[in-house]
Amino acid sequence: MSEITDKFIEIVKSRSIENRKSIHLLFDNGIIGNCISVLRQELDSFIRVIYLGKLDDINERQRLMRLTVNGQEWNELTINGKLRKITDRDMVNFANVLFGYINYVYKFGCGFIHLSNNHDFQNENPFETLSEYDKSSIITYLNQYHSYPFENELTIENFKPYLLLVYEKVSSNMLCHLDELKENRMSD
């Protein structure tokens, strides 16, 4: 394993440790909107780890990790020979093929990172802004991974007991894929 890989993994793990402490403190104090923001931050690390793990070009993987270590944005060379920024959306679309729930966590979490009507969740159900298909898909994922009752309406109050479970699912999957990076393996 290279020095760059070591440093990248250290950065990801440091962020994850802080996220874990933060989400538990926030949850214990009933600060649910910020819990969802922290969940979204953990997902941000996860999509990057997945993206790297799917690259078969180890040199490209190292280059992207080096960009992170140096505090720079990720980019890729286009067919025209120009550098193009790799966006969160690019990585979410890529990762969503492997983990279908990622897009839902990302999209919903963004509503709590950026100022939006989701911050009025005490008065308005932010899940109501989603399509019936999206709500049904979220309930299906919550049921599949965490035994969320199909008959439960999707509200913040009903989701709250599952929030830490969703966080742990994202975090543990990320750490598993981080081990693959450490060993220079491609993700399955």
Q: Which ranges hold each PLM region?
A:
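A cross-kingdom marker of C-terminal helix-rich interaction/assembly modules
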Residues: 1-33, 37-39, 49-52, 58-188
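Cytochrome P450 catalytic-core helices
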Residues: 42, 46
